[in-house]
């Protein structure tokens, strides 16, 4: 049974405007990325937080930008969230997710680490997930460089859509490889099934 969820008028207006063809996945990759980036340019409230961009070497998987987001108030020892962005493995960036991750950091008092992994079609599986795993293994060092000590009892992996898929995969990889101990998952509408004809889709 389908359930209708009422939206705020502003959200409904965005949905209506973005439902007109061509849809983002129907555009050439570069154009689709530009459309998504520009959609996030409108002025909106962003929670107070400092963001620092660093470049992290993930070994054979290459160097990638990683954003370290620090809210005004941080718990001690620091709760840490590793956030993996969604948008189909093809789109998405720190810019498209900045409002969300700043709010998540500010409202939880957590340090947030955001790897801007290499996207398809420029790279193929397993590059993106291995890059994220490498960054996850570097979390204690990244947090120390921010002047904090990470709280191992609250380490959280989070993500939206395919980012939720990757956060789930990171949890399994870490278990099988005996890597960092993940305590919590925060998954926003994660991709857990590729079937488009199921009720959950």
Task: Pin down the residues of each PLM region.
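A glycine/proline-hinged amphipathic helix-loop "lid/cap" segment
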Residues: 1-71
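Short beta-strand element of the alpha/beta-hydrolase
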Residues: 77-88
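Short amphipathic alpha-helix adjacent to the substrate-entry channel of hydrolases
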Residues: 95-114
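Short beta-to-alpha linker loops that shape the active-site pocket of alpha/beta-hydrolase fold enzymes
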Residues: 116-120
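Alpha/beta-hydrolase active-site loop
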Residues: 123-145
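Gly/Ser-rich "nucleophile elbow"/oxyanion-hole loop immediately N-terminal to the catalytic nucleophile
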Residues: 141-158
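Alpha/beta hydrolase fold serine-hydrolase catalytic domain that processes acyl esters and thioesters
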Residues: 152-154, 168-201
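Gly/Ala-rich beta-loop-alpha elbow adjacent to hydrolase catalytic centers
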Residues: 159, 163, 167
């Amino acid at each position: 049974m389908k359930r209708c969820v009422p939206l705020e008028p502003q959200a409904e207006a965005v949905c209506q405007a973005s439902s007109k063809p061509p849809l983002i996945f129907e555009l050439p990759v570069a154009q689709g990325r530009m459309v998504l980036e520009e959609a996030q340019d409108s002025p909106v409230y962003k929670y107070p937080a400092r963001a620092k961009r660093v470049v992290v070497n993930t070994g054979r998987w290459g160097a990638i930008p990683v954003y370290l987001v620090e809210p005004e108030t941080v718990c001690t020892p620091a709760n840490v969230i590793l956030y993996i962005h969604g948008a189909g493995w093809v789109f998405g960036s720190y810019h498209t997710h900045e409002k969300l991750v700043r709010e998540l950091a500010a409202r939880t008092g957590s340090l947030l680490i955001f790897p801007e992994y290499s996207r398809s079609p420029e790279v193929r599986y397993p590059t993106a997930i291995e890059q994220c795993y490498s960054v996850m293994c570097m979390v204690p060092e990244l947090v120390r460089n921010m002047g904090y000590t990470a709280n191992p009892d609250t380490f959280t992996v989070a993500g939206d859509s395919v980012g939720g898929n990757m956060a789930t995969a990171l949890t399994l990889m870490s278990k099988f490889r005996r890597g960092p101990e993940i305590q919590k998952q925060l998954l926003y509408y994660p991709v857990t099934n590729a079937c488009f004809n199921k009720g959950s889709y």
